[in-house]
């Protein structure tokens, strides 16, 4: 898929993996719409890149559709890179012997899994109306995590939501094959994002040393590079690609 002159929506594009992806896609000639929370720095990031910002919640159809409208006003929507998500720790039984919070679990799953389904279905419906170009109408890149495979203690809402995205990928690719829309997922390992930046330096160093090779945190530009490759390679479809330096997460 050639995205030069096409529109692309990047969710979670105000920071981290999403911001790096928006930057890379803009450099490739795409007309990028950044979808992120209204409270995020997305407007400034978009202004710096010459992109468009739409404040939205990925679980809200109306605001997601507003971002998709903004993209289609620029050019046909040919790609989605869905990076938006959140963390949140829940233990099945807490230190006092109480059951883990159902509300906290639902909140993480709603953003990470329901939000992914919502954005994917709405974007795919737009792409399905595109003209077919070289056998394709659109590409959707989703974001899971290595936690889908090796979730750590306390990560049960995050891990199960990300595992849901992994499970969604092949089914979605098969579902959309007749529409000539591809769906592929990236499962990042430990990346140098704003979430990890809040950790003490010694903790960050320890995390980096746990990665076999290269023994460092991933950088968002490496995620962006893979996202662009997925978009441009027509045989990448229905697969979840680990981007993790061969790490396998320990229980804690």
Where are these regions (language model features)?
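Catalytic Tyr-X3-Lys loop
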Residues: 86, 98-118, 141, 165
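Catalytic Tyr-x(3-8)-Lys segment
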Residues: 110, 202-222
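Active-site helix of classical SDR
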Residues: 120, 161, 169
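Alpha-helical segment proximal to the catalytic Tyr-Lys
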Residues: 125, 173-175
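Residue(s) in the substrate-gating loop at a strand-loop-helix junction
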Residues: 145
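Short, small/polar-rich loop/turn modules that mediate ligand/substrate recognition or access, typified
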Residues: 177, 182, 236-239
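C-terminal substrate-recognition "lid" of short-chain dehydrogenase/reductases
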Residues: 219-243, 248
